[in-house]
Amino acid sequence: MKTILRFKWPISILVIIVIVLSLIFAPNLSQLAKEKGEIKPPDSTSSQKYEHMLKDVGANSNSIVAVIKMKEPLSEQGNDKVEHFIKEIKKIDGVNQVISPYTNKDTFKKVVSKDKKTIPVEMTTGDSVKVADKINKIDDHPGKVYLTNNDLVTHDINKATDKGLQKTEIVTVALILIILFVVFRSVVTPFIPLFIVGLSYLFSSAIIAFLVKYCDFPVSVYIQPFLVALLFGIGTDYCILLLNRYKEELAAHDDKTKAVYETFVSGGKTILICGSTIFVSFLVILFAQFDLFRSAVGIGVGVVCLLIIMYTLLPLIMVLLGEKIFWPSKKATSHKENRFWGKLGNLSSKHAFVVILVILAVFLPLIYFTPNKITYDNTNEISNHYGSVKALDIIKDKFELGEAFPVTIAIKDNDKLTTSKGLSDLETLTKSINKIDNVKGVNTITRPTGTPIKQLSATNQLNEIQQQLTKANKGLGQVNNGLGTMQQKVQPLTQSQVVQQQMQQASQNPQAGVQSITQQASQLSQGLQQAQQGNEQVIDGQKEIQSYLKGMSQDDSVNRSGMYISQDMLNNKDMKRSIDQYSANHGNVVLLNVELKQNPYSKSAFKTLNNIKNTVDNQKNGTVFKNSKIEYGGVTSQNADLDHTINTDMTKVIILMSLVTFLVLVVFKRSIIMPLYMMFSILITYYVSMGIANVLFDYSFGEKGVLLVAPFFSLVILFSLGIDYAIFLLNRFNEEVRTHDIHNALITAMKKMGTVIVTACIIIVGTIAALYTSGMLTLMQIATILILGLLIYNLFILPLFIPAVVSTLGKGNWWPLKGPKKQQHK
């Protein structure tokens, strides 16, 4: 610190130059967050492998639904505007496989709402946002059109984040100014923290942007709102701690430089411990798999930038302004003690066991009995003023969500799968999936509208064979008729009397005789012709029947699938259309859409997905799919992967964060016991606040639970803030214990730090509350959990539980060492 004070001007100028250059050349962090901050599971999960599988074969994995709201019911005979609109969509580059309600009658019944006023038009595409923009630019819409899919919802969330960030920044600055004016009663003081923290925010945003662009640093759309809330909150807390300490040191020293030095030697050490703990705590998040979680490391980067500016620019400001920092307050050099916290400390130390018992008796049941519901439905993230959410609300109202967001299955093989055998096995697999509980239906090549194609069923084809046999019988009848005619005409010629009579007539009338013989020959010829035609029909019928029966007998899968798919059927026009719709890569990839009876965002849908996976694994043996790669996509699959990833990451991060924080605190505190109860107090606070928040969201606000990312971010942020406040108090306790006994040192520390901690808590609660202005449900839920946690920690844990534990342990607080060395009071 002496070096910094000695070279304060060169160091400050250098820091300012670095900050200015970084701001000039830094990429746009908001834009980078939109481009690279997609919320998705790791690449190793099935839902991402599904995406990559389709991209590798040149197929589009994104499906957009255009929801058309009509004023008048749609007619089955057609609607010119709707048909024109669909034709215009088909012309757009990047749009494939548009499913029109007029494809056939079955499709019309399936996709059009019961009142026939709502039509979802589904299409596949590569770039959802670009395609959506082009669709919105089509001039003649048949009604109100809303477009939706995961990408479009995310795009709208990004837009909402940008708007919310601007509001959050304004509200945060206003709250800090108001609170600091009240606390310090000074015109100058409030602007010092704002300057330091504002500069830190800009500097850290620039550094993170560089890291994202050039080092593939993890980023998300939430990083900037969190940076605003936390840097302004934590930074202001640190400034308050240092400014309050500076008040004390100014009263004790006439020299401003000496006062600044003592401030940073004592208070600065506390800040350094807090900042280092936060940084390493956030650094371990890099070991998580989920990129959204890993983006929280940016907060650690922000804290480092904050410390750099606080240790370089703030000392210069303090030396330059001195007591004028607190102008016009006349009591600038007095520091008022918090008597209320002193009384709480006295109470908890005298009745330590009772205080600990009461707090645990209240908090542990709250943790155990309150619900812990996590929802993966991000459709409530923003309001339905955005088109993607409006479309989802219409789908929820008019249709089943399971139909709109099916589980998608992709089966890939080195060999062609769209063969007779392959499609028969596909139908067998489809039948098994269709029997699973909570599966509403399956769409694939053999059942494009959810029901098996009638012409493919073996029963239907046996009926065709019966018709062929009937045809053959008619042919045999023709043969019999022809032979009968020949016999009738030839038989008289075999009788001698008749022959003699005809010969006699011929001699008397030669011309008549010739005519009679000619007639006989003609009749004989016709009879032979009938016989020949009948015989050909019989032969053709026999060949056709033999071909069908031979094919069926050689296809082992007919009994399982109930289908026999001949080569002629594969060449059928309608069949080719179905193959094109549900296959890719020239038949090496086949697709299935599994519609669920459940909400695809629910956890119960995850169980159904697991049942589908188990069924497919069991049924693929003995089929052409036994060596195929099978991956699962769709909302349910993605959320199931997120669920597994989040649970794994939460466990991993809690262990690593606790371990690293413990080691850092052991080094600074020179104690094993003190870090343990510090971390325990924070974890119990987190779980209590989560329990209360779940009750609030479930019963009071009508939500279906806490959104998936809220628990994680609430944990890591509350952990960091709680550690800060505990360090504030216990560091001062370690100072005071050098000149007092444990009881008096504790009471003195609480009196000295009570106002600082309460003020810091009010400020951080205010900055976090500013997240409510963002309009984003995730940020509002995180804000609620954090505010609950901060209130619980600063009303019950820090002033009651921690002092009670400290008093109970006595000298054991510093085990295995003896604690700080005693020295005489100055």
Where are these regions (language model features)?
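Feature of extramembrane
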Residues: 1-172, 183-188, 335-345, 350-650, ...
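Membrane-embedded transmembrane helical bundles of large multi-pass transporters/channels
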Residues: 1-33, 95, 126-373, 600, ...
